Amino acid sequence: MTLTVRVIAPDKTVWDSPAEEVILPSTTGQLGILSGHAPLLTALETGVMRVRSGKEWLPIALMGGFAEVENNEVTILVNAAERGDRIDRAQAEASYAAAQTKLSQAEQSDSRQAKIQAVQELKRARARVQAAGGVVEI
């Protein structure tokens, strides 16, 4: 048996295909989903989900959201998402470097909001680099 996996962002459907396995970045850690999984509703962290279709793994950068698992259907509603095979790795790495610089600057300021925004921007940039196949320091 396979899973029906849908990744839906406000502006588009990022993925809608069968898969054998899904690994999600839940707020409590990595969560693996196989056929026959118990019903589940979970919040998702900004990070990389992985979808196994056949022998291939496809990474998808998720920018937070929710996942529902029921009757071998995995529905993922996210703020934004991007398939790893469609991310320009060099651009993603440049965005990650810029986000690191922005975080360093924010840590020097007194603005709590600037720090929070910089951390979120760094998480998004890290997810994009990882989905594109790059390696980043954590």
From Swiss-Prot:
GO terms for cellular component: plasma membrane-derived thylakoid membrane; proton-transporting ATP synthase complex. InterPro entries: ATP_synth_F1_dsu/esu, ATP_synth_F1_dsu/esu_N, ATP_synth_F1_esu_C, ATPsynth_dsu/esu_N. Keywords: ATP synthesis, CF(1), Hydrogen ion transport, Ion transport, Membrane, Thylakoid, Transport. It is found in: Cellular thylakoid membrane. Its main location: membrane. It is a peripheral membrane protein. Gene3D superfamilies: F0F1 ATP synthase delta/epsilon subunit, N-terminal (2.60.15.10), Helix hairpin bin (1.10.287.540). GO terms for molecular function: ATP binding; proton-transporting ATP synthase activity, rotational mechanism. Produces ATP from ADP in the presence of a proton gradient across the membrane. PANTHER family: ATP SYNTHASE DELTA/EPSILON CHAIN, ATP SYNTHASE EPSILON CHAIN, CHLOROPLASTIC. F-type ATPases have 2 components, CF(1) - the catalytic core - and CF(0) - the membrane proton channel. CF(1) has five subunits: alpha(3), beta(3), gamma(1), delta(1), epsilon(1). CF(0) has three main subunits: a, b and c. Belongs to the ATPase epsilon chain family. This is ATP synthase epsilon chain. It comes from Cyanothece sp. (strain PCC 7425 / ATCC 29141). The gene is atpC.
